[in-house]
Amino acid sequence: MIEFGDFYRLIAKGPLSPWLDTLPAQLSAWQRESLHGKFKTWFNAVEHLPQLTPTSLDLREGVRAEMTPPISSGQREGMENMLRALMPWRKGPFSLYGLDIDTEWRSDWKWQRVLPHVSPLAGRTILDVGCGSGYHLWRMIGEGAHLAVGIDPMQLFLCQFEAIRKLLGGDQRAHVLPLGIEQLPELAAFDTVFSMGVLYHRRSPLDHLYQLKNQLVNEGELVLETLVVEGDSQQVLVPGDRYAQMRNVYFIPSAPALKAWLEKCGFVDVKIADMAVTTTDEQRRTDWMTSESLAEFLDPNDPTKTVEGYPAPLRAVLIARKP
């Protein structure tokens, strides 16, 4: 079973230490009461992976690990079998000892769009909300972050993260916890908080913005990446049953509307840093994620629209500061 003791020890003497008042009991209850029916199968795959320590590790240009001399083809095949037991892989890519995990999302492209607008991450304590497999946590460590904590209630993603960590030598600078942000106390302890691809899944987006704010230190920075629509500060799309085949999409504001929401929640220095149309090169079906992807979610006769007739996915990055 996954042990969180290393994380508890890591935060015991720092600004996150008040979290220890609630977190151990919370995660113990999770282990007893909330495990997914497939969790043991997934975690068994993690346990059967070799504990490898790379001789070359690149977290600045990607997530790439190599070893000299290289691992054997038999080791690589066994490693691939265990990692394939953790499919689908959505956020990546990863390059591990000659094995490439070609994930559904080119999360490295998103990182290239986001990073130029973010305050330097070196030495920072960071929270990544909805972190998925933890790909961006490793990129944050590559930028010199002191500690990168990801939260995501999806238990497969936790197992994917632990698998990658094991193959990166058991690195303790990044951690994933199987929690949603509503389960966190108001820590006010993170220098930077990322929320990427989460806001449109929230029934109450302003509550989500307040939750993010409550995790930041004073003068801390929020990095918010989400779906938007074109329009002025009064424009918000409220999809019907589905948006791009997703059921749980509630509000898609324009970027100016989102800026106004952030200001209404008390953030300052809010800027719209980037906007980009999601392409079928960035999100697509792969050998590591074999179900439907963006190409199937767009109108086959008009790729500027979803199959439901809404504007096709457009994503914005906004940067804001907690005063």
Curated annotation (Swiss-Prot):
Record-level GO BP terms: tRNA wobble uridine modification
Pfam families from the UniProt entry: Methyltransf_9
Keyword tags = Transferase, tRNA processing
The yes or no answer to whether the keyword Transferase is present is: yes
Binding, carboxy-S-adenosyl-L-methionine: K91, W105, K110, G130, I181, E182, M196, Y200, R315
Q: Which CDD domains match?
A: AdoMet_MTases
EC no.? 2.5.1.-
Q: Which reaction does it catalyse?
A: carboxy-S-adenosyl-L-methionine + 5-hydroxyuridine(34) in tRNA = 5-carboxymethoxyuridine(34) in tRNA + S-adenosyl-L-homocysteine + H(+)
Matching NCBIfam families, A to Z? PRK15068.1, tRNA 5-methoxyuridine(34)/uridine 5-oxyacetic acid(34) synthase CmoB
Q: Which family does it belong to?
A: Belongs to the class I-like SAM-binding methyltransferase superfamily. CmoB family.
User: Which proteins does it associate with, and in what oligomeric form?
Assistant: Homotetramer.
State what this protein does. Catalyzes carboxymethyl transfer from carboxy-S-adenosyl-L-methionine (Cx-SAM) to 5-hydroxyuridine (ho5U) to form 5-carboxymethoxyuridine (cmo5U) at position 34 in tRNAs.
Which named protein is this? Answer: tRNA U34 carboxymethyltransferase
What organism does the UniProt record list as the source? Yersinia enterocolitica serotype O:8 / biotype 1B (strain NCTC 13174 / 8081)
Lineage of source species: Bacteria, Pseudomonadati, Pseudomonadota, Gammaproteobacteria, Enterobacterales
